[in-house]
């Protein structure tokens, strides 16, 4: 299966002037940072608006989105959870992991 078929929303993006399409061949050779930059320029429901604001604010997409990979299983938009934050169960006073089913 080609990358274009797997990720049609990536390959259907338009250039900033809205008249010229980027080809699949171009997409193949662009850097990860440039691809994220293109995606940030375009309004889309697929994007996390907070991530886009952060990327524009700090100016480096790769510093914030090191988990962005084109070969992600079903969708290239990756949602990550910060492992440094303790996750608490509702009603619990201490941090713990969810119990596994027996």
Swiss-Prot record:
Induction: Down-regulated in endometrial and colorectal tumor samples. Changing residue 8 to S: In some patients with endometrial cancer. It comes from the Eukaryota. This is Protein CASC2, isoform 3. Expressed in normal and neoplastic endometrial tissues. May act as a potential tumor suppressor. It comes from Homo sapiens.
